[in-house]
Amino acid sequence: MDDLRGFLRQAGQEFLNAAGEAAMGAAKDVVGSVINEIFIKKEADTKRVLPSIKNMRVLGEKSSSLGPYSEVQDYETILNSCLASGSLFEDPLFPASNESLQFSRRPDRHIEWLRPHEIAENPQFFVEGYSRFDVQQGELGDCWLLAATANLTQESNLFFRVIPAEQSFEENYAGIFHFRFWQYGKWVDVIIDDRLPTYNGELMYMHSTEKNEFWSALLEKAYAKLHGSYEALKGGSTCEAMEDFTGGVSEWYDLKEAPGNLFTILQKAAERNSMMGCSIEPDPNVTEAETPQGLIRGHAYSITKVCLIDIVTPNRQGKIPMIRMRNPWGNEAEWNGPWSDSSPEWRYIPEEQKAEIGLTFDRDGEFWMSFQDFLNHFDRVEICNLSPDSLTEDQQNSGKRKWEMSMYEGEWTPGVTAGGCRNFLDTFWHNPQYIITLVDPDEEDEEGQCTVIVALMQKNRRSKRNMGMECLTIGFAIYSLNDRELENRPQGLNFFRYKSSVGRSPHFINTREVCARFKLPPGHYLIVPSTFDPNEEGEFIIRVFSETQNNMEENDDHVGYGGKADTITPGFPTPKPIDPQKEGLRRLFDSIAGKDMEVDWMELKRILDHSMRDDLPKPVVFNRFSNNMAFETQAAGPGDDGAGACGLLSLICGPFLKGTPFEEQLGMNDQSNKRLIGDNPADGGPVTANAIVDETHGFSKDVCRSMVAMLDADKSGKLGFEEFETLLSEIAKWKAIFKVYDVENTGRVSGFQLREALNSAGYHLNNRVLNVLGHRYGSRDGKIAFDDFIMCAVKIKTYIDIFKERDTEKNETATFTLEEWIERTIYS
């Protein structure tokens, strides 16, 4: 150790300077790499993962009044530009590169991106129209997307909403195509170029049986762009794609556990033009895919009609529930049991009834079954309930009914609104809450009840799989509300402690959407969507479909100042107000203010850092690297020149010297020997080197500037004594409230308590504002530090005061010019 100390003394200040420069360089490299990792990845994510959501216009709406993003792609603009220049479009947001193919690994062979005219002669968008034969699977595991695409071909109005028909490889061809998908409540236009991945000149992924037909391959590429890459499409549910094609809500039923009113459900779905399908689960123990009854295992059938058919026999007269299905193969592979094409049962059906249902006996893959045989021979039925805007005017005029729909967007923010399921009672009530009001029962419902479908969908998870983000485990619960309970916004802990749910999602499950159907009497109901565990971050939309009108609203607080009724949350003691002694306060102010008898933010910071040093993180400042950082080693004497260098060397080289003899010589294995001291040891004393990352020196300059601005009426940047006195009184109140909610005395409060703490300070905030505060001021574990809590209170008070000043009519409306708004807010 003596040799090492001698070396360090000889190096002296030269070593410290070199080490300081090296440390600064290393720090810059580390910080730079972190910034690059965060922001460059974020930029790539913005451009590649969700290009169409961010950059495409919502169909039927104007673009944002804030002006377009630089990456906005407008189909007509790009098309006309390419036609004018004679060039073919190359999409910079979804380039012909490996990143658009896969995110987990590089392709195992050379992939060549070719345009259709380089793949086939006389390329066509459609060849003799479109059909399910145009949908053939390639090497990508996206059969769920193909099944949905095949179903889409059965409905022309839905098909051409997704796939605009005016596109071709002849007239106005410029290598650009566009497709439309529903994404989380909005229709987005996705633009692509027509370069497609090939191997040995053949399309690798979705393709048509006709080599020169390309609508299906281009549709798949647009869907891949929507989700960031082709690989993002591996594995999924047909329901997911059907929703993206229609904007509907999908539900499915296990026919072995079918509800007693399933036939009525199917009937009403058919009346609303819902898309329906069914299937038989494949049996690994059975080699033949075809059953003795002519049905195909593991194969999707379309349900094309659900009705009651009149039947007249010598022994019976009445109606029989029937279902018509179609095998998409369109061949002789049909049901051969009762009510099949050659079945004798049809002779008991009146001729006018046969004509009414359009009965034919062609070998076209279409056949009829009784509902009971349907339950006996199929395993699963899926229903895609179409949104109200999916029905054409002609369909509505022809008697097709539509669903009534309400929708809200929401967010789970860790420590704020991510409360987890009912198992976590203390935080469950912090989840977003929604009220639906059902007024009229369903028509023809003998029990006077309302059919309600609740669908909870998490947003953007598939598109973020390249960042290791999978679906959260989600679900929801439904509670009835009486008139008195309606007054509570939101419902608090005690409501859920003593109230039982009247409905809930069948499971908490890690799929994009969880959906359930309920029969509820008219009334008011509270829906609480949540993740299974608390503190899981995500965005969602919640939709409610009903046969009669439903009114939906967010059950949340109104933003503003509270009234006299605001109290500390039950169970917490009321804080004692701190009344500073005016004489002592005046002396303190006079000693700091100087000749102008005003304090600026720096002088305010000195006062607050001194008076509230026990409530703030311990000071850490950096000698040579920023302001003044000194290392101290207990083994070194006061005059030992090597002490600071030892500490510095330990900090810089520690990670590289672990497990070597130098670790013991430098004392790196004894954490108690390494300390950092601030400018003023009395402000908090030594702290360990490991605390550097988490600690700051007193109130930040931004907090102090904002506190001055809050009361600085003349915008001088300074406070007089009366303003200073008012500010300290506000801070004393906020400090007292903070201590009440800092139950563990850690200098931090849980984000879940932020609403109650701010309510106690007199501020009412809703979930949207609380989420923003959580993102802005919360730590990774959802905690809020004391100075950040003060900043929250300062900002909220300032902005409310700015707004209230202009809300002269007290109708929650204020008018500012852009200049006025910037002037008022930028100083705050």
Swiss-Prot record:
Entry similarity comment: Belongs to the peptidase C2 family.
Listed Pfam families: Calpain_III, Peptidase_C2
Gene name tied to this protein: CalpA
Residues that hold Ca(2+) 1 according to the record: 712, 714, 716, 718, 723
Record-linked InterPro entries: C2_III, Calpain_cysteine_protease, Calpain_domain_III, Calpain_III, Calpain_III_sf, EF-hand-dom_pair, EF_Hand_1_Ca_BS, EF_hand_dom
Name this protein carries in UniProt: Calpain-A
Residues in EF-hand domain copies: 1-14, 579-614, 699-734, 729-764, 764-799
Residues covered by the Calpain catalytic domain: 88-387
Catalytic-site annotation from UniProt: 143, 299, 327
Lineage: Eukaryota, Metazoa, Ecdysozoa, Arthropoda, Hexapoda
Organism: Drosophila melanogaster
Tissue: Localized to the anterior and posterior embryonic poles just after fertilization. Becomes distributed around the polar buds and just below the pole cells of the posterior pole during cleavage cycles. During these nuclear divisions anterior localization disappears. Localized to actin caps that underlie the plasma membrane, immediately above each nucleus at cleavage cycles 8 and 9. Localized to a small set of nerve, midgut and blood cells in adults.
Residues annotated for Ca(2+) 2 binding in this entry: 742, 746, 748, 753
UniProt-annotated stretches for the region Linker: 558-577
